[in-house]
Design a protein with these regions (language model features):
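Contiguous, small/hydrophobic- and glycine-enriched helical/loop subdomains that border
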Residues: 41-88
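A generic local secondary-structure boundary/capping motif
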Residues: 13-15, 32-34, 97-109
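Broad gene-expression machinery/nucleic-acid interaction feature
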Residues: 41-43, 85, 94, 114-118
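Single conserved hydrophobic/aromatic residue that forms the stacking wall/gate
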Residues: 1-9
Length: 178
């Protein structure tokens, strides 16, 4: 999945991705490219009136939207933190990334904020490095030596099946909304 402004040919090895059976799609939010395999990722989206983030910086709105997730992941035993503007990471690497778009009010409507997150439940790191072009700058920002070590999937840390992780995250999200 490529962000709205990304150059697909710079961010992905398009021919390799197609040979591996991937379809490259573009989302309407910013951020980088995401490597998504069905069953190996967990995603969620929030859609709220723009007033939800009124008076907040972009960074504050990311933290508000993902606070419940960070707490839920900690309850699963993961040592997670916010990393930069849009990443959720452990001491070993990136666990997930968020992106956001704000829609201005139109036709008398309130405007909206779209926020979504992709989490690595499990990952084929070697395949990811073949499909994505991850820059040296990105690696140095993350203080890791290889793209394969850049991502830290939760399966190896929790020992839980994906369905159990999803169920616990849903329970945490429901508790926050009540």
């Amino acid at each position: 999945v490529s962000s709205t402004a990304s150059d697909v040919y710079k961010r992905q090895n398009v021919h390799t991705a197609q040979d591996e059976g991937f379809h490259i799609v573009r989302r309407c939010t910013g951020g980088g490219a995401m490597f998504i395999e069905p069953g190996n990722t967990i995603t969620y989206s929030l859609y709220a009136p723009l007033d939800f983030a009124h008076g907040m910086s972009v960074e504050e709105s990311y933290e508000l939207c993902d606070y419940w997730l960070v707490e839920a992941l900690r309850a699963l035993g993961l040592n997670v933190r916010f990393a930069g503007l849009n990443d959720i990471a452990t001491q070993y690497g990136k666990l997930g990334g968020a992106a956001q778009r704000r829609f201005a009010p139109t036709h008398g409507g309130p405007g909206a904020i779209l926020h979504h997150v992709t989490l690595a439940y499990d990952i084929d790191a070697e395949k990811m490095t073949r499909v994505l072009n991850i820059s040296r700058e990105k690696m140095s920002d993350k203080a890791v030596k290889s793209a394969a070590k850049h991502v830290d999937p939760m399966r190896s840390q929790t020992g839980m099946g994906r369905d159990e992780v999803v169920a616990r995250l849903v329970d945490a999200a429901v508790r926050v909304t009540m």
